[in-house]
Amino acid sequence: MSVTNVSNETNATKAVFDPPVGITAPPIDELLDKVTSKYALVIFAAKRARQINSFYHQADEGVFEFIGPLVTPQPGEKPLSIALREINAGLLDHEEG
């Protein structure tokens, strides 16, 4: 009885995926450097995302109560992702209280 060693070293092709977006871009570690806690980041980003969302809704009506995105939005990008990119870029100041 003979045993043959077969090597599994074949040229495996690696799957190519789009990089994840949203909370992973910008990285959470970079965002946490901008605020005092992860809870402050959540509140800060949520408030700004609501402002951006309201801006889009009011722009259709011709009312401009809120300021629109301070970064160039990507096609189909959600308000929360825009807000996180603004925070990471240092374009916003916030007060905790």
From Swiss-Prot:
It comes from the Bacteria. GO terms for molecular function: DNA binding; DNA-directed RNA polymerase activity. It catalyses: RNA(n) + a ribonucleoside 5'-triphosphate = RNA(n+1) + diphosphate. Gene3D superfamilies: 3.90.940.10. GO terms for cellular component: DNA-directed RNA polymerase complex. InterPro entries: DNA-dir_RNA_pol_omega, Pol_omega/Rpo6/RPB6, RPB6/omega-like_sf. Pfam families: RNA_pol_Rpb6 (PF01192). Transmembrane segments: none annotated. PANTHER family: DNA-DIRECTED RNA POLYMERASE SUBUNIT OMEGA. The RNAP catalytic core consists of 2 alpha, 1 beta, 1 beta' and 1 omega subunit. When a sigma factor is associated with the core the holoenzyme is formed, which can initiate transcription. Belongs to the RNA polymerase subunit omega family. Promotes RNA polymerase assembly. Latches the N- and C-terminal regions of the beta' subunit thereby facilitating its interaction with the beta and alpha subunits. This is DNA-directed RNA polymerase subunit omega. It comes from Corynebacterium glutamicum (strain ATCC 13032 / DSM 20300 / JCM 1318 / BCRC 11384 / CCUG 27702 / LMG 3730 / NBRC 12168 / NCIMB 10025 / NRRL B-2784 / 534).
